[in-house]
Amino acid sequence: MNKRQLIQSFLAASALSFGLAPAFAQTPTPIKFQLDWRFEGPAALFLHPAAKGYFKAAGLDVTIDAGNGSGGTVTRVASGAYEMGFADLAALMEFHANNPDSPNKPVAVMMVYNNTPASVMALKKSGITKPADLTGKKLGAPVFDAGRRAFPIFAKANNIGAVNWTAMDPTLRETMLMRGDIDAITGFTFTSLLNLEARGAKTADVVILPYPDYGVKLYGNVIIASPKLIKENPAAVKAFLSAFTKGAKEVIANPAAAIASVKARDGIVDSKLETRRLQLAIDTVINSPDARTEGFGVVNAGRMALMASQVSDAFNTKTRVSPDAVWTASLLPPAAELNTVLRK
């Protein structure tokens, strides 16, 4: 070996040892990730760690796309179009129970919204002040709305009689309430409240009946993964959850700064509005009293079993929901990592 070849061999070996040469670097694992909704405040939970390079540092090439509802996200992960996603746990349970023979049913791998964000909202002038006042009223929501789907659970917990439902596109829900076409709506609090304000309502004039405050302890959104990815590359799922956890801690600590990642993906968003939306989500469903009691990322077995039973009944599923089939804690980061996320 001549002197030039010796130097080249030394440089190549050095590059391999220190990870400096792309030619020798390990190829990142691609993961397509589907959100539950548009690029709004809560999307910062995922866009922030991506922008900070946490997924990349974990050996992942993560692509994050906006969604159009949890049901669609579950279906797309089940179809193989996406490896992972963010979706309402009730929607995942419904898919499992209605598609028992599906070979690729997604699995929840981390709890993010410890409480459902669903609530009933009305204007004070309607005279609605408590759940019992909803009996006989006209309620409105898109047919796929999580609050509407789970309303039978809310109604049973609060002895609400029959109500009349009106369906509409999501963009018309709050408008129809403001016009008086309907008496109340269901929706995620941090979405519908801000939408009502944007249409001229004052916060003080809006009555909010959050499901968790009225006896409905449903879990909300979870990170889901395809069973194929879990089986073939569990290390990738673990790496994703660890990077997400690191980012989530920063988002919760400084929501205003994290919104920059949302603005970068959708330049027309109102940063001030989305910061408020994110803060509402943090306060009501992410860093909620229930979340601080149970811990970030995990679930309570008894509460999960109750939800599975409630969803089976309320959604009239083909088969009963099996809690063990929809959830696994085996890929979560260590408790030492998870326990640093929430502010006490």
Give the location of each predicted region.
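Short, surface-exposed acidic
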Residues: 162-165, 203-206, 268-279, 317-326
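Short, glycine-/small- and polar/acidic-enriched structural segments
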Residues: 25-179, 183-190, 209-211, 216-217
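N-terminal export leaders
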Residues: 3-8
